[in-house]
Design a protein with these regions (language model features):
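Short, hydrophobic-biased segments on the C-terminal half of alpha helices
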Residues: 67, 85-86
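N-terminal leader segment of winged-helix/HTH proteins
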Residues: 1-42, 91
Length: 157
């Protein structure tokens, strides 16, 4: 027994397996590992993929999108988002151009970026399908609905 610790007093859970946070930690770590192995073959990190897919989604109808909108949807702080976009730009996958107001920069995919996303998105979705294959369709739908409740408002709109 660890000296000075009494888990019956400091935790509401009898075992770690009853802790949603503990379970989420293990699930997310395992899931990320599976996704990262797929993306590595395409030369992308997981954050780069998230931003690339976000740019692709937000510009799919020809709309202009700035870094603020990308960061909001991707759940990234402005500095991290900017660094990831800079890395995508250096790889030739995205480009930034000044917006009409001059303060923000619009981001779009290059032809190479679109090509990579056309490979990466189906590969990630296949990895997702494989990872979640222990769940039947009803369980997967319920899990997705539950996750949607936990995502901060405005992120996936």
């Amino acid at each position: 027994m660890s000296e000075g610790l009494n888990f019956e007093k400091i935790s509401v859970h009898d075992t770690p397996k009853q802790s949603p946070g503990f379970l989420l930690w293990h699930i997310s770590t395992s899931w990320r590992t599976s996704i990262e192995s797929v993306l590595k073959t395409l030369g992308l990190t997981h954050p780069q993929f998230v931003v690339l897919a976000t740019v692709g989604w937000l510009t799919r109808n020809g709309d202009l999108v700035n870094q603020v909108a990308i960061g909001k949807m991707a759940g990234l702080d402005p500095n991290t988002n900017s660094q990831i976009i800079k890395g995508l730009e250096q790889k030739g996958l995205a480009k930034r151009v000044p917006s009409s107001d001059g303060r923000a920069k619009n981001v779009s995919l290059t032809k190479t970026g679109a090509h990579i996303l056309n490979q990466a998105l189906p590969a990630v979705e296949k990895a997702d399908s494989h990872f979640f294959n222990l769940l039947n369709a009803k369980e997967l739908n319920l899990m997705t609905q539950t996750f949607q409740k936990l995502v901060p408002k405005g992120v996936t709109d």
